[in-house]
């Protein structure tokens, strides 16, 4: 048992003189401004894994302004990843104030706040004081992997998957929450007495934005806890018993687009309606306007997350994709298939930091474009195992097909193509399980700006790849659900009209060549699988 001690979190961030001079985080609402921007807007709070961001959206969907502030990552032990929840709150409030200050916005012109957040990150705090009893355990944290192994070995996988659409994994909240209750002195007893509150990061922001009046979450975040039944739309008593979680700690669950309450007036000078929330990937699906069954989006970040709208039935995936909740507006329920790829943009960072063949990430496209193809080189970026649809924790990255003629340009191109091949594998699984052809893939994230990658992606999946003008789709989704709740936008058709295309990449590669390359990729992929076990047996 560990006793964790935290200083009492600030309700407002401490601001030093340097911050005031550099970032202007403090807003004086009593002064008479020289100029004030007179436009109605939605404020999206985008709380991510490495930074807190605030983005202002106008009614036409354009971005008025952005503010961002990074926060500290904590790695107390190998495989453990934590965040200071107080720092998350203070940075999020700071950037919200900053973006209003930058653009001289009148708070009364902010129609609503929408929240999107890193999913699965788990936090418990004291209801009376608002103090976290432990650092937030981040979605990347693997400390409960052995607990998950034990649950799978005990035969609980089918029950959990049928109820939640998820596989038993340390990625999700349930075992993280149980770990906190079992390892913080007195936590379990206090939880059972109703003294503690559990939440994902959206819940933590709601709590602080309302001065502790609101303990709530939305359906998309609830669906990632491994405690919420996606069919009944309720916390599941059998799952709560399995993971030893007392019901007293749980937040209320609401549709993504919903008036949750309003902010404390002291935070921004006036109260602002809290119009919605959604986990980051579901928010991006909505931000990409994928509101009809069969529509899919892929986010290219450190990894890739592909979601496909599958409509009103929470169909199980024979290919072991996740079945998750899409944004709900209080009317019909919608679901999505999700496929996670662990390493995507991170492979470019490895080319830079690990191999040193590029000086900056932006160089990879021009280097890769300097050769016509990879000259038979394939790179399987299984540095952290393989995600969907392979789910092989023992796979490792491999680089095959090397000759004396191989250059760094061939390796750079193979790295980009390795991202696209992984996406194609997930898309194939979605096509197979849904029976939908999927003729268009909407894309966002940093690597979506890489034209070479996007063209190869279109070629290898045999479908259009569509890049939107506004690539801040995660924040846009949060803005949309909040704006729909308050009537800022009338309906989803209103939002569809403002969604605009930047560029469409049409498949150009002959089908025979696509088939040949995918056969070679599949051969390379097989060689990467179960590598750790093979290495162990060889020793």
UniProtKB/Swiss-Prot annotation:
It is an enzyme of class 2 (transferase). GO terms for cellular component: cytosol. ATP binds at residues 49-51, 302, 345, 349, 446. Pathway: Polyol metabolism; glycerol degradation via glycerol kinase pathway; sn-glycerol 3-phosphate from glycerol: step 1/1. Keywords: ATP-binding, Glycerol metabolism, Kinase, Nucleotide-binding, Transferase. ADP binds at residues 49, 53, 302, 345, 446, 450. Its EC number is 2.7.1.30. CDD domains: FGGY_EcGK_like (cd07786). One of its GO terms (molecular function) is ATP binding. InterPro entries: ATPase_NBD, Carb_kinase_FGGY, Carb_kinase_FGGY_CS, FGGY_C, FGGY_N, Glycerol_kin. It catalyses: glycerol + ATP = sn-glycerol 3-phosphate + ADP + H(+). The keyword Amino-acid biosynthesis does not apply. It comes from the Bacteria. Glycerol binds at residues 119-120, 171, 280-281. Key enzyme in the regulation of glycerol uptake and metabolism. Catalyzes the phosphorylation of glycerol to yield sn-glycerol 3-phosphate. Belongs to the FGGY kinase family. This is Glycerol kinase. It comes from Rhodopirellula baltica (strain DSM 10527 / NCIMB 13988 / SH1). The gene is glpK.
